[in-house]
């Protein structure tokens, strides 16, 4: 029997209740619902956005209200997978991108609404989902809902809060807003705002009805993961009566955000994988915050730990692999379980390859201070340009002419006050450079999205006086990732490890005992 078949069989057996009698958990069906509803212990189909396939896909996850019966400091793989499903559902739907430029309710939160309904949660509130995806604020969208049950004679309220981590458009530029202090400015600002939103939701719920024992279930993927990681520390301090053992936090593909100085309100179990002298612990310490990280994924390495940044809680690394049997199993999953575009695990980066990419980046940027002073504004505006789309660009595949590019650049956060003729000269030079850059992306089949953004991206870099070769290289990588173009390049292979499907497959394939304290590749 192949490893995957055994794991599936074991999961089905457990889901059917074939546990030792003494270990059986209370069934959700025995509960009385006061708000929302109790649901059977079962697998539920949740939708998620797939940037890899340019589509909305669905996947099945096990859920039970009894997953919250134990202390949050106890790692629970079934709860982790359910959280990943909810975190992915919190992303903007792919279908809603047809209204990319619009402000208002256009279906961005359709997947998380559906997920909450299937799992029996009610009183859904959405924060920041109605912004146009052309906006670039230091915020994050978040979906919150609750259910209040009477289980075993005790009243319990479970509040789910999931932060959007994909499909957020020009908000992407905030991922590069490190700032000059000892914490990532963009992530901290988003976490502080959402703390107030969640506190308001809890207080309003408590006014309507006693909550009983409050349990908070939080999660996020990528940008959503780091904001949820910071939120986890803050809500324990901000919400009276909320015990740490009742705050269940699972994050995925989590960037680092905090240095050791300042911001004590955003720190909890900080850098929990390491001792005070920086050495790796033998095993995880106690925490209610679990960060699940694919060993080859480059995003959790930004900003570099060598610059003094770490996460709250316990980092659990999913292994990369070069083991032939494991690759065969994973590639079978990649062909059958995640949409029309096969996911080839043998092509994804190992931890060593990703480390080499990061080393080259650190050598280029030199230090955190040098990055902030010389590159941060340029990279933020280059990225913002990659994610701005007008109605004509979305619906008619319009490619801006040079005059229109000049006007767009004059709306960017850091270029509003730059001399008109300096911007114009940069755009004209970028038009000339663009043909060579597009050929480096795909000489025969240049995607329309790459054609739309190549001149604006190049022009921004030139406006800031970056070297032409550096501007071309940065633009190439942005174009390849936006256009989902694979290439035999370690940086692209490391970036493609970031796809949500990679995390789902690795979580389902590897047992918790095979999670690692640091990035690892199996052979």
Regions found by a protein language model. Give the residues of each.
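The feature captures the conserved acid-bearing segment of alpha/beta-hydrolase catalytic domains
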Residues: 248, 253-342
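Active-site loop->helix "elbow" adjoining a glycine-rich segment at hydrolase catalytic centers
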Residues: 222-227
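C-terminal segment of N-terminal export signals and the immediately downstream linker at the start
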Residues: 1, 21-43
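A conserved cap/lid and substrate-binding interface adjacent to the catalytic center
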Residues: 110-219, 230, 234-251, 264, ...
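Short, polar loop/linker segments at the starts of domains and inter-domain junctions
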Residues: 100-103, 176-183, 304-311
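N-terminal export signals
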Residues: 5-28
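C-terminal catalytic-base region of ester-bond hydrolases, centering on the histidine
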Residues: 298-523
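N-terminal low-complexity, Ser/Thr- and acidic-residue-enriched intrinsically disordered segments
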Residues: 33-121
């Amino acid at each position: 029997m192949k490893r995957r078949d055994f794991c599936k069989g074991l999961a089905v057996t457990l889901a059917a209740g074939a546990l030792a009698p003494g270990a059986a958990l209370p069934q959700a069906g025995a509960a009385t619902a006061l708000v929302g509803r109790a649901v059977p212990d079962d697998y539920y189909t949740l939708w998620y956005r797939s940037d890899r396939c340019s589509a909305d896909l669905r996947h099945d996850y096990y859920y039970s209200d009894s997953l919250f019966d134990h202390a949050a400091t106890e790692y629970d793989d079934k709860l982790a997978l359910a959280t990943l499903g909810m975190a992915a559902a919190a992303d903007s739907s792919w279908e809603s991108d047809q209204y990319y430029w619009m402000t208002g309710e256009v279906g961005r939160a359709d997947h998380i609404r559906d997920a909450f309904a299937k799992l029996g949660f009610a009183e859904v509130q959405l924060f920041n989902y109605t912004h146009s995806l052309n906006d670039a604020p230091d915020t994050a969208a978040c979906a919150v809902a609750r259910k209040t049950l009477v289980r075993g004679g005790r009243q319990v309220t479970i509040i789910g809060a999931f932060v959007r981590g994909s499909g957020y458009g020009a908000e992407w530029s905030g991922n590069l807003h490190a700032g000059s202090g000892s914490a990532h400015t963009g992530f901290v600002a988003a976490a502080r705002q959402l703390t107030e939103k969640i506190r308001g939701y809890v207080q309003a719920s408590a006014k309507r009805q006693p909550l009983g024992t409050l349990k908070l279930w939080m999660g996020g993927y990528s940008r959503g993961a780091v904001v949820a990681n910071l939120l986890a520390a803050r809500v324990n301090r901000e919400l009276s009566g909320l015990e740490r053992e009742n705050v269940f936090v699972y994050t995925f593909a989590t960037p680092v955000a905090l240095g050791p100085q300042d911001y004590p309100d955003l720190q909890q179990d900080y850098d929990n994988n390491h001792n005070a002298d920086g050495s790796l612990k033998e095993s995880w310490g106690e925490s209610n915050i679990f960060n699940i990280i694919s060993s080859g994924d480059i995003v959790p390495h930004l900003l570099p730990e060598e610059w003094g940044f770490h996460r709250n809680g316990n980092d659990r690394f999913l292994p990369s692999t070069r083991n032939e049997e494991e690759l065969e199993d994973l590639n079978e999953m990649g062909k059958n379980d995640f949409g029309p575009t096969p996911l080839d695990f043998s092509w994804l980066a190992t931890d060593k390859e990703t480390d080499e990419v990061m080393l080259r980046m650190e050598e280029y940027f030199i230090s955190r201070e040098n990055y902030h002073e010389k590159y941060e504004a340029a990279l933020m505006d280059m990225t913002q340009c990659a994610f701005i789309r007008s109605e004509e660009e979305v619906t008619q595949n319009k490619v801006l002419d040079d005059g229109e590019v000049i006007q767009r650049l004059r709306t960017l956060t850091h270029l509003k006050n730059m001399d008109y003729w300096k911007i114009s000269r940069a755009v004209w030079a970028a038009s000339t450079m663009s043909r060579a850059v597009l050929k480096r992306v795909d000489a025969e089949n240049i995607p329309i999205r790459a054609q739309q953004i190549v001149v604006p991206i190049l022009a921004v870099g030139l406006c800031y006086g970056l070297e032409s070769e550096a501007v071309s290289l940065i633009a190439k990588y942005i174009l390849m990732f936006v256009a989902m173009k694979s290439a035999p390049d370690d940086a692209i292979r490391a970036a493609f490890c970031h796809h949500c499907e990679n995390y789902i497959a690795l979580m389902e394939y590897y047992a918790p005992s095979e999670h690692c304290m640091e990035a690892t590749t199996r052979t």
